[in-house]
């Protein structure tokens, strides 16, 4: 950067100062008593910097101090006020606005430069000697003192109701941690060390020792601590009057830093903090008074983080480090005293950093030269500062800084500074929350302000040095506190002159989010003193800002504009309490404070009006206007009530009153978010790692004018700690069973529990669950009349509410019909369920009169209503009541009918109901009548009752003819009449509830129907008119699809041709709809001859068939038998090009009415064609083929000539066209095979296709048609393919080719079929398992289309996994090794084989040698040992099937696996695992059996003898348990249902007379008698079907 001297002003360009606004100064760290600073106070993402200080003329022990830079990267410490305050006219201001820490997820970050990476600002730690904390004191009683009355105790005055004349509103303390009340310096007792320096202590920095903040982590609850008393009550913050006095001597006083929010530390650490604070002030004062500085300042700034791990820091100047860290045990005077002469614009001074740090509780310790007063007067002259490092400075440190003038374009683009070596030993960070620094003369104020003006550049240099310090700072700092404390205390007591410096900052420096981001610890340490100091500073700061705004007017830097925008976006409005601010850890809170990048944040500038009290007027009357006081509304100190504050209800509020601010839209780019996209206002205490969030992009360009404002946004505060109490209604509705009045009686509780169980059962009642639920009902205790009536009411209400389930509810009542209970009023008598139920039904049936009364009343109300809204409401209520009554009546009638069908009601009662309903001619009664007759008509309409029924129906017909009722009712009556005429067989199926089996069955039928319709539709689509096709004979045909129909060939099974075995054609050959060869679909010639004699007369259309040449090759060998494809082939029409192998039929009239063909010589109309064909039909005798008449022969002259050619080429045509036809026939074969699973039939059909070389089409169709179906379907298809290959009906080449067509598209198909690789493996596995094709051959062929897409390994792993389930890991590994295959050949290049196998769990394949367990000699295990091992695996270890397979194969050979010993041990272990003992009863856990079915199936292997051994083992296990009732029957049921044991094995066990197995056999047989009875009955039924 080129150095460019600034002649007009030594300060940075500043934006216009805007009116101050009330903010929440909560960023000051709370100084809390604690032991030594913890070793890790600062987070790893924050920098810690040390700044050297100037030598002071006072006897003050000097040492390096650490300062923590604030959130303001490149902008000076001032930000425009919110929109609700007036905006001054645009003009240059001495401060830059910038985003506050609340604008980012973390409290500190680095300046954003467009072309430079963002670095995080770091806490600058001012190491000083640390002295052991003094003895802790107990918590003191709260005393409230008035600083304007010399510290007079006014506690009693306030408690007694007298108003306090304190100029600041009460500043509440956070409620999270109880702390004693804070005190102002003028209020503290004599023995307490003063935090604000005395007159002589101009060096007292406006920042607190970092140690104080660090130490606060040690102890959560601070204790009162003596503080130094200021010799003068005026040692508060500088008053505005004094500030004005200094205006003439300072050019930019506003930059003076003093933490406005200074919580007076009541802890022992205050002493050290005060000591450190006394050291820091001279630096800021001295520096601020100098207009020009040399690069030595930069050097010292960069060297200010000695011995610490330095990190590159963004710097405004490019600084080259030329010195190395040196020994630290040297005196201060020997250390780097370098003259500094650099233009203030070029030197990034620490002033703003000081300002920031002071506000957040950290001060830079800078020593001022002795000539401070003189230098103050020379604003443009270069100044030589001698900076001394008090302790352990390096002998030689030299930084070469190339200053450059800071212009609007250059500020944002400074390069980061390289890491600088440590210059001094690390010290404990010092945080001084002092709000005012008193100096010996007004020039000190000027000095401090000047230093602040240089903050832009110096802070950037410092920010990097601090990054690596944090791990060391606390280690060596403890020992240096004592010296500094002593000197500071001495100085503070010496100072006799009450000169004060205004060290406050504009209130807008600290953004609302900055305050809200402070931790719970920071909020706790807020003092009332802090607010007073803020008030005293504001006026002075305003005057200094006005003065500075007159002298410096450079253009605004674009980066600053961006910052201004960011401030507006994120920091415009003060946020009362930031979510999670209290839950941030203490360490984070310290960092948050120390790292906020501007001291401006803590100063609160309040507009003192002429008529109101001012801090300079100590004796004046304290009165303020409303706006002034409202400025304090959302300060954290005002929001949170102190712990020990007395309950002054008139003054102190318990809760904050949130203002309702208008909502504004937040720019999503600026709104800070956490890593999970949580916005900042919902950040519940989470500290975002990594410092600040993403830098603000393109923000400055949206605010080009300083005065441009955005409307305030609404602050949404969410408290996660606050319990939200919902308002409870006094008379809230509760369910009857939960009301307290009923809960007292134990009998009532039992009754309600009974009703609850009945409701639960009723809700679950379905036809499928009926038996199971009825068992539960039978177990209920219904022993009183009240309970019985309650149960009946529940059942009845449920039945009439759900008429479709009335059958189930009626059956439930049938089961309960015998239930009797004693009557309540007559103890000797009983009442039964049936009587009460019928009474309930009758009461509901006769309820219509009561309903009519209700309806009449509502109708009168409706007629009397005058208002339209009232009429509408009443009308709706009336209609709703009628509808409800109608539905209840219909439900009741339906329920009554079902009860009658179950013989619970007599026939006479039903006739009475019918008569009653017929008498009432209202629509509701007639609808009920229809529903009743539909339900019970068939049962009432028997021979004896027919005359009565005739009367009913005659009356109904009369009602229909009279047409006095609505059409809906008339149609309902007519439907019932028609139903009786149809012998009560409904046209529609019953729409009641169905079982799962019924639903599945109907779904399967529906699916088949849909497939048939789709196939018909596809056939019709191929007949679209106007599409010309050229057949093999060269004929152009126009296919018309008008009115075309395809019929099921099963309806034409007996229609055959009387002569040759050729197809029937109703129109010329190329016409699309010609019939197939007979509707039989290709019967062989012999079959056709046999049928011809008996059925030839049926084929009346045989004369329409064109004459076939004698040389024509019959097509029967390749035709497909219709018997095999009735379900799927009936919908298939012929192809447009009229292949000679038709497979479908069509109506004759379809083609009589179809479009004319091009082979017709004349353009005769369709009517003429139809007429000629009908005349021909009439002439048929049915015995012989008749030649066409002369006209037709003439028309077909061309076709006749082409006929021989076609017949000669028939074989070639068949081959050329067979692929598409073969696809269709293959689909038919596969559909039928999957439906009936007849391998023999399917193989015969494939053989009849006679399409060697084209069977790859069959394979492809098989794969495609089963790919998305069930696993069993794919397994069956794989088995069929294996058998075809095994029988050599399907060649391996066709097999591979058929699969390859699918494999080429498999990767794309995986999008729609995610498990396609598993499905393909299921189709292939049977081939490998049975050895139809070798592993090597299949793997190589299948991988060819998959290698380009890198999926070969995936498919191969799925195949191997399936093989492991069916064979064993050992065998699969052997197969792989025998195939001599390498995984590298099947995986994408660069993929690690071992990792792939581990991921796919195929690592067992890698090992060439068997595992150790397999290598062991397989000794013969006894039955007991086998059982114990298997029991441990299955019951204790709960091993999965794979583990059991592995163990068995590792320990047993093939002979042992088939031995009865092993089979019995396995069956015993599985059955034992499945037995559940409930007290004295036993039952079977069918889930365990189902889980172990694969193991049983594998080793029993469907072998009857092995299954018999398993049954013997089961019998022995039951005998050991003393044969619990029904346990063996349950096992038999489960094993039979899961198809583990076959019927033959059960019968064999039943009839077995083996003497070794007779123990308990008789009892076992007796217990399963019902099972065998059911088994035989089921077998007989299947035979009958």
Curated annotation (Swiss-Prot):
**Known partners and oligomeric status:** Interacts with EIF4A, EIF4E, eIF3 and PABPC1. Part of a complex with EIF4E. eIF4F is a multi-subunit complex, the composition of which varies with external and internal environmental conditions. It is composed of at least EIF4A, EIF4E and EIF4G1/EIF4G3. EIF4G1/EIF4G3 interacts through its C-terminus with the serine/threonine kinases MKNK1, and with MKNK2. Appears to act as a scaffold protein, holding these enzymes in place to phosphorylate eIF4E.
Report the GO molecular function annotations: mRNA binding; RNA binding; RNA cap binding; translation factor activity, RNA binding; translation initiation factor activity
Note the coiled coil stretches, chain numbering: 447-475, 994-1023
Changes after translation: Following infection by certain enteroviruses, rhinoviruses and aphthoviruses, EIF4G1 is cleaved by the viral protease 2A, or the leader protease in the case of aphthoviruses. This shuts down the capped cellular mRNA transcription.
Q: Where is this region: PABPC1-binding?
A: 134-162
List of residues that carry Phosphoserine: 230, 232, 267, 441, 495, 1156, 1218, 1409
Name used for this protein in its record: Eukaryotic translation initiation factor 4 gamma 3
Regions of biased composition (Low complexity) lie at 10-21, 594-603
* Record site feature (Cleavage), residues: 699-701
**Outcome of mutating residue 814 to D:** Reduces binding to EIF4A
Give UniProt keywords alphabetically: Coiled coil, Initiation factor, Phosphoprotein, Protein biosynthesis, Repeat, RNA-binding, Translation regulation
Residues annotated as transmembrane = none
Q: Name one GO cellular component term.
A: intracellular membraneless organelle
Q: Which residues carry this modification: Phosphothreonine?
A: 168
MIF4G domain ranges (all copies)? 755-983
Q: Where are the HEAT repeats?
A: 745-783, 784-831, 832-905, 906-944, 945-984
Where are stretches of biased composition, namely Basic and acidic residues? Answer: 216-226, 611-620, 860-876, 1185-1203
Check the record and name the Pfam families matching this protein: MA3, MIF4G, W2
Recorded superkingdom: Eukaryota
Here the segments flagged for biased composition (Pro residues) are 167-183
UniProt xrefs under PROSITE patterns? MI (PS51366), W2 (PS51363)
Region Disordered: start-end pairs:
1-36, 128-190, 208-232, 305-332, 567-620, 686-711, 729-749, 860-880, 1017-1042, 1072-1219
Domain MI span(s) in chain numbering? 1221-1343
């Amino acid at each position: 950067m080129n150095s460019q001297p600034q002649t007009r002003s030594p300060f940075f360009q500043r934006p216009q100062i805007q009116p101050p606004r009330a903010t929440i100064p909560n960023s000051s760290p709370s100084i809390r008593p604690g032991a030594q600073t913890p070793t890790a106070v600062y987070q790893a993402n924050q920098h810690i910097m040390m700044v050297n200080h100037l030598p002071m003329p006072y006897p003050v022990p000097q040492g390096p101090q650490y300062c923590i830079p604030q959130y303001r990267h490149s902008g000076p410490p001032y930000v425009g006020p919110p929109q609700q305050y007036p905006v001054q006219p645009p003009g240059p201001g001495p401060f830059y606005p910038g985003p506050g820490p609340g604008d980012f997820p973390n409290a500190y970050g680095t300046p954003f430069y467009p072309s430079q990476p963002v670095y995080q600002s770091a806490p600058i730690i001012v190491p000083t000697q640390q002295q052991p904390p003094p003895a802790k004191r107990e918590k003191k009683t709260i005393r409230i003192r008035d600083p304007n009355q010399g510290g007079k105790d006014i506690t009693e005055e306030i408690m007694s109701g007298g108003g306090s004349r304190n100029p600041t509103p009460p500043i509440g303390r956070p409620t999270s941690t109880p702390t004693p009340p804070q005190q102002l310096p003028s209020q503290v007792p004599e023995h307490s060390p003063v935090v604000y320096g005395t007159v002589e202590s101009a060096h007292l920095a406006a920042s607190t020792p970092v140690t104080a903040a660090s130490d606060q982590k040690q102890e959560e609850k601070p204790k009162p601590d003596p503080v130094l008393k200021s010799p003068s009550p005026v040692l508060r913050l500088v008053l505005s009057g004094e500030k004005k006095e200094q205006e003439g001597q300072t050019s930019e006083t506003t930059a003076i830093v003093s933490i406005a929010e200074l919580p007076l530390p009541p802890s022992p650490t205050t002493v050290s903090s005060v000591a450190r604070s006394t050291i820091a002030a001279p630096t800021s004062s001295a520096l601020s008074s100098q207009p020009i500085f040399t690069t030595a300042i930069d050097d010292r700034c960069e060297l200010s983080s000695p011995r610490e791990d330095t990190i590159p820091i963004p710097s405004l100047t490019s600084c080259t480090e030329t010195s190395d860290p040196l020994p630290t045990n040297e005196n201060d005077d020997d250390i780097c005293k370098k003259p500094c002469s650099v233009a203030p614009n070029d030197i990034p001074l620490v002033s703003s950093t000081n300002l920031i740090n002071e506000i957040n509780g950290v001060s830079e310790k800078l020593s001022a030269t002795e000539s401070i007063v003189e230098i103050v007067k020379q604003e443009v002259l270069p100044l030589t500062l001698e900076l001394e490092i008090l302790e352990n400075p390096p002998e030689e440190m030299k930084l070469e800084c190339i200053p450059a003038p800071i212009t609007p374009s250059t500020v944002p683009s400074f390069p980061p500074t390289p890491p600088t070596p440590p210059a001094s030993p690390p010290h404990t960070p010092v945080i001084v929350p002092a709000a005012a620094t008193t100096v010996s003369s007004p020039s000190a104020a000027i000095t401090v302000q000047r230093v602040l003006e240089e903050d832009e550049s110096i802070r950037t240099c410092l920010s990097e040095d601090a990054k690596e310090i944090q791990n060391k700072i606390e280690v060596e700092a403890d020992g240096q506190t004592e010296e500094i404390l002593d000197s500071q205390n001495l100085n503070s007591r010496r100072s006799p002159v009450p000169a004060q410096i205004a060290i406050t900052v504009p209130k807008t420096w600290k953004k609302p989010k900055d305050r809200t981001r402070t931790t719970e610890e920071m909020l706790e340490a807020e003092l009332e003193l802090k607010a007073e100091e803020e008030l005293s500073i504001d006026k002075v700061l305003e005057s200094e800002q006005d003065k500075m705004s007159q002298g410096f007017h450079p253009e605004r830097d674009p980066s600053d504009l961006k910052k201004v925008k960011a401030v507006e976006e994120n920091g415009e409005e003060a946020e009362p309490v930031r979510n999670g601010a209290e839950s941030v850890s203490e360490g984070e809170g310290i960092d948050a404070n120390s790292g906020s990048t501007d001291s401006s944040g803590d100063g609160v500038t309040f507009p003192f009006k002429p008529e109101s009290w001012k801090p300079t007027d100590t004796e004046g009357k304290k009165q303020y206007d409303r706006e002034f006081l409202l400025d304090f509304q959302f300060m954290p100190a005002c929001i949170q009530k102190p712990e020990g504050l007395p309950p002054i209800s008139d003054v102190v509020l318990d809760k904050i009153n949130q203002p309702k601010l208008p909502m504004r839209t937040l720019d999503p780019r600026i709104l800070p978010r956490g890593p999970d996209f949580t916005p900042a206002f919902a950040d519940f205490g989470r500290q975002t790692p990594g410092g600040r969030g993403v830098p603000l992009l393109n923000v400055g360009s949206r605010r080009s004018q300083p005065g441009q404002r955005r409307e305030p946004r609404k602050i949404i505060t969410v408290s996660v700690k606050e319990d939200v109490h919902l308002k409870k209604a006094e008379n809230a509705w509760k369910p009857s069973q939960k009301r307290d009045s009923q809960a007292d009686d134990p009998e009532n509780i039992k009754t309600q529990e009974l009703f609850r169980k009945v409701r639960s059962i009723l809700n679950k009642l379905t036809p499928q669950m009926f038996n199971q639920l009825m068992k539960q009902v039978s177990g209920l205790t219904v022993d009183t009349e009240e309970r019985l009536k309650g149960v009946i009411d529940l059942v009845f209400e449920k039945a009439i509410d759900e008429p479709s389930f009335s059958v189930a509810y009626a059956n439930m009542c049938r089961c309960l019909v015998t239930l009797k209970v004693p009557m309540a009023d007559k103890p000797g008598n009983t009442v039964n369920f049936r009587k009460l139920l019928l009474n309930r039904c009758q009461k509901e049936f006769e309820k219509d009169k009561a309903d009519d009364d209700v309806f009449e009343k509502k109708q009168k109300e409706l007629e009397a209503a005058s208002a339209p809204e009232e009429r509408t409401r009443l009308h709706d209520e009336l209609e709703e009541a009628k509808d409800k009554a109608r539905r209840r009546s219909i439900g009741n009638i339906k329920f009554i009918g079902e009860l009658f069908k179950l013989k619970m009601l007599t026939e006479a009662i039903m006739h009475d109901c019918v008569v009653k309903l017929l008498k009432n001619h209202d629509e509701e009664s007639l609808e009920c009548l229809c529903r009743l007759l539909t339900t019970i008509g068939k049962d009432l309409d028997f021979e004896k009752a027919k005359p009565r029924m005739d009367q009913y129906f005659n009356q109904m017909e009369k009602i229909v003819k009279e047409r006095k009722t609505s059409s809906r009712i008339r149609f309902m009556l007519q439907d019932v009449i028609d139903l009786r005429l149809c012998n009560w067989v409904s046209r529609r199926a019953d729409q009641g509830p169905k079982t799962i089996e019924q639903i599945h069955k109907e779904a399967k039928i529906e699916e088949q129907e849909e497939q048939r319709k789709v196939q018909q539709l596809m056939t019709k689509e191929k007949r679209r008119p106007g599409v010309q096709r050229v057949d093999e004979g060269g004929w152009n045909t126009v296919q018309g699809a008008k009115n075309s129909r395809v019929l099921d060939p099963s309806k034409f099974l007996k229609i055959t041709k009387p002569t040759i075995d050729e197809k029937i054609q109703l129109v010329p050959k190329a016409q699309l709809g010609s019939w197939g060869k007979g509707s039989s679909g290709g019967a062989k010639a012999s079959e056709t001859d046999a049928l011809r004699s008996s059925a030839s007369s049926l084929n009346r259309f045989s004369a329409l068939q064109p004459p076939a040449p004698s040389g024509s090759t019959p097509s029967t060998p390749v035709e497909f038998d219709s018997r095999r494809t009735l379900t799927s082939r009936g919908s298939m029409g012929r192809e447009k090009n009229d292949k000679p192998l038709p497979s479908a039929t069509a109506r004759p009239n379809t083609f009589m009415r179809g479009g004319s063909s091009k082979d017709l010589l004349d353009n005769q109309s369709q009517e003429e064609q139809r007429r000629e064909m009908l005349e021909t039909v009439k002439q048929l005798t049915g015995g012989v083929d008749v030649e066409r008449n002369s006209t037709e022969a003439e028309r077909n002259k061309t076709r006749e000539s082409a006929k021989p050619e076609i017949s000669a080429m028939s074989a070639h045509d068949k081959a050329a066209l067979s692929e598409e036809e073969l696809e269709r026939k293959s689909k038919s074969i596969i559909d039928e095979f999957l439906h009936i699973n007849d391998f023999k039939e399917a193989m015969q059909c494939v053989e009849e296709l006679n399409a060697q070389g084209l069977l790859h089409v069959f394979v492809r169709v098989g794969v495609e048609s089963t790919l998305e179906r069930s696993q069993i379907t794919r397994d069956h298809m794989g088995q069929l393919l294996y058998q075809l290959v095994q029988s050599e009906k399907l060649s391996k080449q066709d097999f591979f080719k058929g699969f390859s067509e699918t494999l080429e598209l498999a990767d794309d198909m995986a999008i729609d079929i995610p498990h396609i690789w598993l499905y393909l493996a299921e189709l292939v596995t049977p081939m490998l398992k049975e050895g139809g094709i070798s592993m090597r051959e299949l793997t190589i062929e299948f991988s060819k289309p998959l290698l380009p897409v890198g999926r070969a390994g995936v498919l191969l792993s799925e195949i191997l996994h399936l093989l492991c389930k069916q064979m064993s890991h050992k065998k699969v590994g052997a197969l792989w090794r025998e195939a001599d295959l390498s995984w590298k050949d099947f995986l994408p290049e660069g993929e690690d084989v071992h990792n792939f196998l581990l991921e796919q769990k195929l690592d067992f394949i890698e090992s060439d040698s068997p595992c150790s367990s397999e290598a062991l000699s397989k000794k013969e295990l006894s039955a007991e040992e086998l059982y114990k091992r298997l029991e441990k695996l299955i019951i204790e270890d709960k091993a999965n099937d794979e583990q059991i397979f592995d163990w068995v194969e590792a320990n047993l050979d093939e002979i042992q696996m088939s031995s009865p010993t092993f089979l019995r041990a396995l069956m015993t272990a599985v059955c034992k695992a499945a037995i559940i003992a409930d007290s004295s009863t036993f039952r079977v856990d069918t889930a365990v059996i189902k889980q172990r079915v694969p193991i049983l199936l594998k080793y029993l292997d469907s072998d009857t003898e092995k299954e018999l051994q398993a049954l013997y083992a089961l019998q022995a296990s039951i005998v050991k348990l003393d044969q619990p009732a029904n346990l063996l029957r349950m096992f038999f049921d489960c094993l039979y249902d899961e198809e583990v044991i076959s019927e033959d094995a059960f019968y064999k066990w039943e009839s077995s007379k083996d003497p070794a197995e007779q123990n308990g056999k008789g009892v076992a047989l007796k217990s399963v008698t019902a099972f065998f009875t059911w088994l035989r009955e089921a077998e007989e039924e299947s035979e009958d079907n």
